A protein has these predicted regions:
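Active-site-proximal alpha-helix that buttresses catalytic centers in soluble enzyme cores
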Residues: 2-6, 27-124, 128, 132, ...
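Active-site-adjacent alpha-helix immediately C-terminal to a catalytic or transition-state-stabilizing loop
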Residues: 41-44, 60, 109, 117, ...
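N-terminal chloroplast transit peptides
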Residues: 2-21
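Short, cationic low-complexity segments
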Residues: 278-300
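Short catalytic/ligand-binding loop motif for oxyanion handling, primarily in non-cytosolic enzymes
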Residues: 60-63, 107-111, 135-138, 168-170, ...
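Phosphate-handling substructures
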Residues: 117-205, 252, 270, 274, ...
Length: 300
């Protein structure tokens, strides 16, 4: 595949990639940005190029073995290093995202900031949406994973965590952990805010954002970065790769490792790969798989 050179940085020879031309009307005036799907389609590149998915690094609650979900916690020291390493890997691959999409949660925001800083691209515009948030774990949020497994049984907790369409117990609207009480969601209709979610719910809330926000940016930019979470990225991979419900349940996305897709003009993946050392990628993926069984430390 011929990758759009605008997605890449300078070549080894030092020559800069060609600049993206301004769109101008016949009179020479700069053309307005497209506002409709038809306008976007009309100016779409023959090859939209590259989509990079990045799962945030380890958080402090991952380190403490607590269910996190929509709870807003920062990266741990290890998570900070994972984010910096992700930026280094993207820089070494000469990726130059034109825009970043991320969730409203701090651990994803920090991952984006650290990665872009390492790439010397902190100026890249960032768009945020609750639709890219981690899966909401309901009443499990803030609970110790091992203690929860001891209380309810490992099989029950594994079903809550890794099934496609089974939700954990929900939060009451009066519970301070409910997103109704979080100011960052104050402008959203209350009926959109979950009290708990299964992976199927995450797929259903993520897809409108894919079509309405990410797809137009893929047509306008040679490279787009999505910085999010294990379950919101699994939802996106399910759509991109055409995975069935069981396949996506078994999918394990490692933390802090860029997953790079090369797309055709119809936004179908031509190929994908993880950046970085294959052994390290396999180790992190295996760690995520072990976490699903209730072992310590999970990036959820």
């Amino acid at each position: 595949m011929a990758i759009d050179s605008r997605a890449l940085g300078p070549s080894p020879s030092g020559a800069a990639p060609p600049a993206q031309p301004l769109r101008r009307s016949p009179s020479g005036a700069t053309r307005h940005l497209p506002t409709s799907g038809e306008e976007v389609k009309a100016i779409a590149k023959p090859n939209p190029g590259i989509l990079v998915l990045l799962r945030h690094g380890e958080s402090t609650w991952n380190l403490e073995n607590l269910f996190t979900g929509w709870t807003d916690v920062p990266l741990s020291d290890r998570g900070v290093q994972e984010a910096v390493d992700a930026g280094r890997l993207m820089k070494e691959a000469r990726l130059r995202p034109g825009v970043v999409h991320e969730s409203l949660l701090l651990r994803a925001i920090q991952t984006t900031q650290l990665a872009l800083a390492k790439m010397e691209m902190s100026w890249v515009p960032v768009k945020r949406s609750w639709r890219l948030n981690e899966r909401h774990y309901g009443a499990l949020q803030g609970l110790n994973k091992k203690q929860t497994a001891d209380q309810y049984g490992e099989d029950k907790v594994k079903l809550w965590r890794r099934s496609y369409d089974v939700r954990p117990p929900g939060l009451e609207p009066s519970d301070e952990r409910h997103p109704l009480h979080d100011p960052r969601y104050s402008t959203l209709p209350p009926e959109l805010l979950p009290s708990t979610e299964c992976l199927k719910d995450v797929v259903e809330r993520m897809l409108p954002y894919w079509y309405d926000a990410i797809v137009p940016d893929l047509h306008l930019n040679a490279c787009v970065l999505v910085s999010a979470h294990g379950n919101s990225l699994r939802a996106l991979v399910k759509h991109l790769d055409g995975l069935d419900d069981q396949e996506v349940v078994e999918l394990n996305i490692p933390t802090g490792v860029p997953r790079m897709y090369e797309l055709d003009g119809d936004l179908r993946p031509r190929s994908w790969r993880y950046l970085g050392d294959p052994d390290e990628v396999a180790r992190r993926a295996a760690a995520v798989k072990a976490q699903a069984s209730g072992s310590k430390s999970s990036s959820t």
